[in-house]
Every structure is written in C-alpha cells, then in structure tokens.
C-alpha cells in the first residue's frame, strides 16, 4: 500500500518506505526531549551572537542533493534542500548559514532563543534519504543585571538604620545575599518578580543594622554562573568629648554668676551713693538753719516741726 507523507512544511515528498519515515519522526521527537545528551553546550548573553556547530565532516562527493535541517526542539529554524536555503519567520534577518560546515549563526540573541538545537544531515542513497549525521547543541542565554543600587530607607528606631538594595533586567532567576565580613546577614522584605513578556527579573531586599558601630555591607546577586554586587559603608557619627558638655554648663553658670554679682554691686553702689548724697544734703540744710535763726529760734522751729 502506498504511503504519501510530508516531512515538514514546503518540503518535497519523501520517497522512501513508511517504516523509515516513522523512524525519522521518532528521531525528531527524541530531539525535542533531549536535555543532557548533547554534543556541546554554549552560554551567551542577550544581544550577543552565537555559532552553533554541526560538526559534520562531509566526504568529497556531490552535496547538491543533501538535506540539512536545523531545529530547536520540535520547531524548524532553517532547511537546505537541493541547495535552496529556507529560513523560518521567527529567525529571518537574524540568522546566517555556513554551507561549508553546515553551522548556524544566530544574531541578536533573545531569551526565547535558549534551548537545544539539532543539526540533521540526510543523504540520498539508493533513491531514499537516510540520516547520516546528528549533532545536538544546548544554548543557554543570560541577561546581566544592572549594578545594584543601595539607598537608605529610614530609621526604624533610634539606633537602627534600614537600607534597600535593588537591581533589574537579569536572567536567569537570581539568588540574593546580604554579607558582612563574609558572614550572611538576615534580610527582610526580599522580593523577586519576573516580567511576563521580557522574562527578565527584578529583585529588591532590605536590611536593618545597628548604627552604633561601623559597617561595610555587601549586596550580592547571583544568577547562573554570573554575579553582581555593591558595597555600602556606614561610619558611626563622632561623639562629643566627655567633658565638653560639662565645660559648657560650668562656663554658662560662671558667666551668669559674674553678671549677677556685677549687677548687685552696681545696685549697692548706686544706693550708697544716693544715701550719702541725701545725708550731705540734710547736714547742709541744718547748718544753714543754725546760721539763719540762731540757737533758740532754731530750737523753737524744731519744736514746732515736732
């Protein structure tokens, strides 16, 4: 019974018996499930370019009828059939193909490009196509976090200060640590969020510390095999000399006492001067009376006044 099957969109019909076609489909399914049995593992950053090697040593023979497929899991990236290159829409304008080594170059990497890629080479033998080479390449992609930003976030109590560390734009999922002299400190309010569209992570955490001593605290963010960090330095405020306050108090008290004494002395002097003047005036008046009226008249006048 005839069997007409098509390997992929817009490719010629495969003219070989159904058992071999079924075997090929089983192979492609296994390619989409491969996680560890890969020939090579590569790690790149977002916006980088990567060369995925096919590792195929082609014999010196006619290659015009070879079929080369690059796939990512169960999705086709590009195909070369009868010398004609076809690139699938998701990879158009950002892929290059080396027709001598069958290598694939992807430009402007994005996070969605990560995964396991397979290079399949088929050759025509006795009228049918057989798989002659299979290479698996696992591509990991990371996005670098921004340099952490540490800010002061108030004082929960008199001798306690709170700081916040923040970073964004990274991938894969980060791990956060507060460190001082190599010792991990317990942070609070640590949050990790991921943007559903870009898949990039944002992370923030807070830490409370005692302000009565000096500190050098590190905010450390690890993601994949990379990390970023930032240091925060705190120096306790200088204290006043132990006797400076007492000196100021004593000086103020002494100055006040001096002013008080001066005021009292001035008042006493003014009072004495006034009293002395009053007595001199009285004595002068009595002398004048004695000279004017004589003793008897003066005595009579004094009696009248009494």
Swiss-Prot record:
Q: Which residues form the signal peptide?
A: 1-37
CDD domains linked: IgC1_CD80, IgV_CD80
- State which ranges are Cytoplasmic (membrane side): 269-306
Q: Does the keyword Ribosomal protein apply?
A: no
A single Gene Ontology molecular function, please? coreceptor activity
Summary of the knockout phenotype: CD80-deletion mice have fewer T-follicular helper cells compared to WT, and residual T-follicular helper cells fail to mature.
Keyword terms:
Cell membrane, Disulfide bond, Glycoprotein, Immunoglobulin domain, Membrane, Receptor, Signal, Transmembrane, Transmembrane helix
Could you tell me which cysteines form disulfide bridges? Answer: 54-119, 165-219
An annotated GO BP: positive regulation of T cell proliferation
Glycosylation (residues): 93, 99, 149, 189, 210, 214
Q: Which domain of life is it from?
A: Eukaryota
Q: Which Gene3D superfamilies match?
A: Immunoglobulins
Q: Which GO terms describe its cellular component?
A: external side of plasma membrane; protein complex involved in cell adhesion
Q: Which residues lie on this side of the membrane: Extracellular?
A: 38-246
Q: For the region Ig-hinge-like, give the residue spans.
A: 227-246
Q: How does it sit in the membrane?
A: Single-pass type I membrane protein
User: Which tissues express it?
Assistant: Expressed on activated B-cells, gamma interferon stimulated monocytes and non-circulating B-cell malignancies.
Compartments in which it is found: Cell membrane
Residue stretches making up the Ig-like V-type domain = 38-135
Q: Which residues cross the membrane?
A: 247-268
What the entry lists under PROSITE patterns is as follows: IG_LIKE
Q: What does the annotation say about its assembly with partners?
A: Homodimer. Interacts with CTLA4; this interaction inhibits T-cell activation. Interacts with PDL1/CD274; this interaction blocks PDL1/PDCD1 binding and thus PDL1 inhibitory function. Interacts with CD28.
Physiological role: Costimulatory molecule that belongs to the immunoglobulin superfamily that plays an important role in T-lymphocyte activation. Acts as the primary auxiliary signal augmenting the MHC/TCR signal in naive T-cells together with the CD28 receptor which is constitutively expressed on the cell surface of T-cells. In turn, activates different signaling pathways such as NF-kappa-B or MAPK leading to the production of different cytokines. In addition, CD28/CD80 costimulatory signal stimulates glucose metabolism and ATP synthesis of T-cells by activating the PI3K/Akt signaling pathway.
PANTHER family in UniProt: T-LYMPHOCYTE ACTIVATION ANTIGEN, T-LYMPHOCYTE ACTIVATION ANTIGEN CD80
What is the designated name of this protein?
T-lymphocyte activation antigen CD80
Source organism of the structure = Mus musculus
């Amino acid at each position: 019974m005839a069997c007409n099957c098509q390997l992929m969109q817009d490719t010629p019909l495969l003219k070989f018996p159904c058992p071999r076609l079924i075997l090929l489909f089983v192979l492609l399914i296994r390619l989409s499930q491969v996680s560890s049995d890969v020939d090579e593992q590569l790690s790149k950053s977002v916006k980088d370019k990567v060369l995925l090697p096919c590792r195929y040593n082609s014999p010196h023979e006619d290659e015009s009828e070879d079929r080369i497929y690059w796939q990512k899991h169960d999705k086709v990236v590009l195909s070369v059939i009868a010398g004609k290159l076809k690139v699938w829409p998701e990879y158009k304008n950002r892929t290059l193909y080396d027709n001598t080594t069958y290598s694939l170059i992807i430009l402007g990497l994005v996070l969605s490009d990560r995964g396991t890629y397979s290079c399949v080479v088929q050759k025509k033998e006795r009228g049918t196509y057989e798989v002659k080479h299979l290479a698996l390449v696992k591509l990991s992609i990371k996005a670098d976090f921004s340099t952490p930003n540490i800010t002061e976030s108030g004082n929960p109590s008199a001798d306690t200060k709170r700081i916040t560390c923040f970073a964004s734009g990274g991938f894969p999922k980060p791990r956060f640590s507060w460190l001082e002299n190599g010792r991990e400190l317990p942070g609070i309010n640590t949050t990790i969020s991921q943007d559903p569209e870009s898949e990039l992570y944002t992370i923030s955490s807070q830490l409370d510390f005692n302000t009565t001593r000096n500190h050098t605290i590190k905010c450390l963010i690890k993601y994949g095999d990379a990390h970023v960090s930032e240091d925060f330095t705190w120096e306790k405020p200088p204290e006043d000399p132990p006797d400076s306050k007492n000196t100021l108090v004593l000086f103020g008290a002494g100055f006040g006492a001096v002013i008080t004494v001066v005021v009292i002395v001035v008042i006493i002097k003014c009072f004495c001067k006034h009293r002395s003047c009053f007595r001199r005036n009285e004595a002068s008046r009595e002398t004048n009376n004695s000279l004017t009226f004589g003793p008897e008249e003066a005595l009579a006048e004094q009696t009248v006044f009494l």
